[in-house]
Amino acid sequence: MTIHNHTLGFPRVGLRRELKKAQESYWAGKSTREELLAVGRELRARHWEQQKAAGIDLLPVGDFAWYDHVLTTSLLLGNVPARHQNADGTVDIDTLFRIGRGRAPTGEPAAAAEMTKWFNTNYHYMVPEFTKGQQFSLTWTQLLDEVDEALALGHHVKPVLLGPVTYLWLGKVKGEQFDRLSLLNDILPVYQQVIAELAKRGIQWVQIDEPALVLELPQAWLDAFKPAYEALKGQTKLLLTTYFEGVSDNLDTITALPVQGLHVDLVHGHDDVNELHRRLPQEWLLSAGVINGRNVWRADLTEKYAQLKAIAGQRELWVGSSCSLLHSPIDLSVETRLDAEVKSWFAFALQKCEELALLRDALNSGDTTKIEQWSAPIQARKHSARVHNPAVEQRLKAITPQDSQRAHAYPVRAEAQRARFNLPAWPTTTIGSFPQTTEIRGLRLDFKKGNLDAANYRTGIAEHIKQAIAEQERLGLDVLVHGEAERNDMVEYFGEHLDGFVFTQNGWVQSYGSRCVKPPVVIGDISRPAPITVEWAKYAQSLTDKPVKGMLTGPVTILCWSFPREDVSRETIAKQIALALRDEVADLEAAGIGIIQIDEPALREGLPLKRSDWDAYLAWGVEAFRLNAAVAKDDTQIHTHMCYCEFNDIMDSIAALDADVITIETSRSDMELLESFEEFEYPNEIGPGVYDIHSPNVPDVAWIEALLKKAAQRIPQERLWVNPDCGLKTRGWPETRAALANMVKAAQNLRQA
């Protein structure tokens, strides 16, 4: 039996982020819809051709999305919230953009759909909305049109469809509550219609993605798969596709389904391929996801070959990416600034396609010469001085439990901090960043390009910090920040100043819609060669008698928003970062900075997909934070900031961080989030966000006062702070001034009440 290869999907944005530029041009009214559609066609044609040229047998179609593939599925099913519908009932690309962004070149603006993380990745999807008695119909033929496009170009294709059970799992009920799983029989006819249309086009295999099968699902949801796939069987072969974790726990459910193949993620799961071979029906195809679709590392193909060799020829076998290559940058060959050694360790999406071709050929021929050559740099990396720093490894081994304990418990620290800072009731502060103006961005860009020397750059940054301090003093804030003018991104900035990280020029991956991120890559042991934030914090503090917060990004967030190493555990990386930043805390303290904020917005999103794995993750995540912070003296106040919509299930861990003050995002939930802290009897201080910084709207004083009074019903007033929801870097100065003035006024009114 000949072994074939395939990918589960390919990056959409284009090597030079062409899709992003076309989207934003269209949204701004600078280009036409036809011009936007033409860019999409050009990108799809190029990406199919590139994958084919790299040696991919079966090309994915339907992985392209104008905003998000879950949103594409919503349109396919005719699931358009009433507020986003066209007056004439039709669906077009602007309908899609209104759901994603709240506005489009045509139609009335309306609140965008909710956006949340796609499983445990850094990609975000638009949450489907379900209402009782909802009707579904095939209204958006993008998948069929793109299949026709690919077939016309002569490609051998495999359409990609998000499966019905996972689609319902990912959504939320709006309005009257009901069980959204009850909609399964209503959406299945649309799926049947789509699969019938694909069969008419001569399609043999359809990749139907059901990543929910890697979760610890309630029994009712597991039971739903059998009737769903009974309804879909028969017209084409179905490749049931899972990723991001293993499927062993749900294998009994899976093997009872009337499908013809199963794709498993053999990178992130712990499934044994020989056990899968033994338990799957013999006539099924097994697609082995052995090439990591969500990292940048070259694969050890000799290891992958050994993993699969025993079952090659025993059943129909494909080799594939672990998940869609959406989560990987496109092409390593355009990275001209990486040195040859480091570059030899990497593989981006196109190189991962080449890996799949090399692995397929070796398994078919038995000749391992080429895969041995490919894997040689991986062996060399194991001994590279770029990777291993004996001093870091030694320091990690020397950690004791005492290293993650503050000198005294919170009540003792709180007394020392009150004596030091003497803050008023309802103390006001911000989360850290101030508007990143075109002047600030231009200053950083000129310096990066070499058009501005270091002295003039520093003078410029100092001036922006001075302005930020002056603005805050005018507004009457109690605890100030320096505004972060020198920082492009809260993770990238620290990565640039820590040994063990490298940066790419074009390593962009899609985060959501037109937003792309360029994550740093952890290539080796992490250490801090010199202080990072001390100089600017010290300068800002010299400009005022009020306390200025030192601002750090926490170890778990830096880990989660980077491409991590694969040769050590995530726990090891987090603790290395924590030790490096521990030294930063000590240096800030020595420089006279008395309040230090360590942001951990990613602590919750780093949770493993299986709940049974949560405790182990949270244990080391909390320890990393404490290791970072515990060097601080009693009268140094440690803050942390988190932006989650759910705290209930991790409250123990939030409390275990033992931060003196936690600031959280609560304005959009009308302070409901504080219920978790009240029920838990959270012992330390809390700053519930009093206005939503994601909106340009300026909250009025009475509204903020009402929110704070509501907060004081749940949390003792002496432990409450007053602050916005999040950092202000994306806002303009006019609305920032107005909103903060109202926030300060509300706090002053409550002090006098």
UniProtKB/Swiss-Prot annotation:
Binding residues annotated for L-methionine, in chain numbering: 431-433, 484, 599
GO biological-process terms attached to the record: methionine biosynthetic process; methylation
Cofactor list: Zn(2+)
Keyword set includes Zinc: yes
Positions that bind L-homocysteine: 431-433, 484, 599
Purpose: Catalyzes the transfer of a methyl group from 5-methyltetrahydrofolate to homocysteine resulting in methionine formation.
Name the UniProt record assigns to this protein: 5-methyltetrahydropteroyltriglutamate--homocysteine methyltransferase
Organism of origin: Cronobacter sakazakii (strain ATCC BAA-894)
